């Protein structure tokens, strides 16, 4: 673990660590004391991550949107540019706590210009990477869970205004 330069997003219920190249490398979900889903910062081989693969000519910069906990990772090259905005929502509510903290993480991919080419790598490793990961892929979402604990499931939803191709089983 040579590089500890991570962005942090969270909502007072849990938090994620996002590397300089836009990979979620640590996330316990849905709560701080829950088992990890992504832990590649500890084990690159089987820890799990959720990120982007771009060619070597991309320049990647990262900063926070001013006055927010929204992390912006910008990918730029001669062929195109896009930005990824990462955040976890926290809403005001009328209950005794005053806040609603859903177990949700958002990764908004925004096209800036050109024709950027990238690959999304989604490799969850639920429950501290103990057991086989089961992925159910549908046109609307990817469901993932650990083979020995099928009650704790995570869903990755993809919404796109352009053509999006998800692999099938």
What spans do the regions from the language model cover?
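Acidic, contiguous internal or C-terminal segments within carbohydrate-active enzymes
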Residues: 80-126, 164
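Conserved small/polar residues in nucleotide/adenosyl-binding loops
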Residues: 162-168
